[in-house]
């Protein structure tokens, strides 16, 4: 099963992107794309590890930290959660990027191109469709249009998962 990374840092799409990613068992970036998020994966993994360490410290009953230090750790954790919260479970770079507004997320597009990761993108009239492997011409600003596209994409992902899990497995051998 391919792993998708849904990317949209527009406020109006943040919740939609998070919901579809969680519903389909994939990942998302809905706050800010950090430069090098996939091209410099080892550094990002270290940041995820730091986030997990902060959570362990804050959840621990035995603490050797002062209230001030715990407050600082809490602030750092919140900041890291905003940017990395949707990729904490990601173990390696994704198989496919699904990008809403390829103009705004141009750094994500360039990183995916550099690594040869296929891109599915909602491409508005102000975007270059030549940069995207699978462009979807649509309004990338409207919440309803993005919701419609993602709902249909979710159905496709769900039906693909159901087909792979059901049956006697002979379909895959053809």
Question: What are the roles of these predicted feature ranges?
Answer:
Residues 6, 97, 149:
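Residue-level signature of catalytic and energy-coupling elements of molecular machines
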Residues 20-73:
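Long, charge-dense
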Residues 129-161:
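Structured adenosyl-cofactor binding patch, chiefly the S-adenosyl-L-methionine
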Residues 155-174:
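Intrinsically disordered, compositionally biased charged tails
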Residues 79-84:
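Phosphate-interacting basic helix/loop segments used at nucleotide- and nucleic-acid interfaces
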Residues 1-3, 7-9, 15, 89-93:
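Membrane topogenic/interface segments and analogous intrinsically disordered interaction regions
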Residues 104-136:
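Nucleotide-binding motor/catalytic cores of P-loop/tubulin-like NTPases across gene-expression machines
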């Amino acid at each position: 099963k391919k792993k998708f990374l849904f990317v949209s840092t527009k406020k109006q799409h943040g919740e939609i992107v998070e919901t579809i990613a969680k519903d389909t068992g994939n990942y998302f970036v809905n706050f800010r794309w950090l430069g090098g998020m996939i091209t410099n994966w080892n550094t990002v993994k270290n940041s995820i590890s730091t986030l997990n360490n902060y959570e362990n410290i804050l959840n621990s009953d035995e603490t050797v930290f002062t209230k001030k230090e715990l407050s600082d750790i809490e602030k750092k954790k919140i900041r890291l959660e905003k940017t990395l919260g949707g990729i904490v479970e990601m173990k390696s770079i994704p198989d496919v990027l699904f990008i809403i507004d390829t103009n705004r997320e141009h750094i994500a597009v360039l990183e995916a191109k550099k690594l040869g990761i296929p891109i599915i993108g909602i491409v508005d009239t102000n975007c270059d469709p030549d940069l995207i492997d699978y462009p979807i011409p649509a309004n990338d600003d409207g919440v309803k249009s993005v919701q419609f596209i993602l709902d249909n994409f979710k159905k496709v992902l769900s039906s693909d998962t159901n087909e792979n899990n059901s049956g006697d497995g002979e379909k895959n051998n053809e």
